[in-house]
Amino acid sequence: DVERSRGLGDVYKRQLYNWTDSPWKGQGYLDYIMQNFYTNEPDGIIGNEDCGQMSAWYVMSALGFYQVSPGIPVYTLGRPMVNKASMHVKGGIFEILVKNNSAANKYIKEVKLNGKILDTLFISHTDIIKGGKLEFIMTDQPVK
């Protein structure tokens, strides 16, 4: 129940759908949480901010990836909120591009890493720090 996602450390659970046969469900929930529970109002962050944990979750999720288990260098991919972002990393620049991004297009149709279509919704920490390009193609229909 998304409405119960008002507690500290609970919002990340939507990324766990990537380990099921229904990752599109998590993408829909992520969109709902980021659109409704994070605003620029005084009470715009759900639950307890806990020294930045909730903000960090939002920033990473809005970029389209999140490390569910600290210490394990794997990131799960989800519904990005940005159209474009870049990060300076050890290997140069890691660029995130999101095509067809809109309020209606909240589902991932395809993801490419450095031009290669991914067959999974996971990337490694090494993929990020080497630099390169992560490209999301979004759609308004769940990809089942």
Give the location of each predicted region.
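Non-catalytic C-terminal accessory modules of carbohydrate-active enzymes
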Residues: 10-144
